[in-house]
Amino acid sequence: MIAIEKIIKAAQSLKGVAIQTPLQYNEILSKRYNCKIYLKREDLQVVRSFKLRGAYAMMEALPKDKLKKGVVCNALKTKGKLFMPVTTPKQKINQVKRFGNGFVEIILTGDTYDAASAAAQAYAKEHKMTFIHPFNDELVIAGQGTVGLEIMNHNLEDIDYVFATIGGGGLVSGVGSYIKDIS
């Protein structure tokens, strides 16, 4: 479990970087399942994903000398490299280019996430850069946990369940840590 203080600190570092996305009532799903269903609109982030939260929170915690060497991830205003599979949708690539504002070099390699990740880790090691794991790092999870903080700040009446996608587990770990801590 991630300490709530780390999630709160990550939320502070994300001000002006990530937007606080709305929690939107979904009438169709609510009627279908006979309950109130809200969707957290992380697709409205400039890179169309919650992953910005974790990567940026991690970079904010890095010492300046490590940032100067660069990072291997999708970064904001620091020299960095982003490794993605060749199968990555063009829309995602274009959003990262736009958001990276010339600071991010995109390297398409491998057919799968695992292949791209292995290439990124090898590159980071070879060039003495910091590899920012997309989900398996405490600071990344804290950044992703800010989604849970925002959900709970909406002050909805009686939340019974929170569902989150599970890829690597960083989002659900961060959201779950925050909600469990305050409940």
Give the residues covered by each predicted segment.
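PLP-dependent amino-acid enzyme catalytic core
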Residues: 1-183
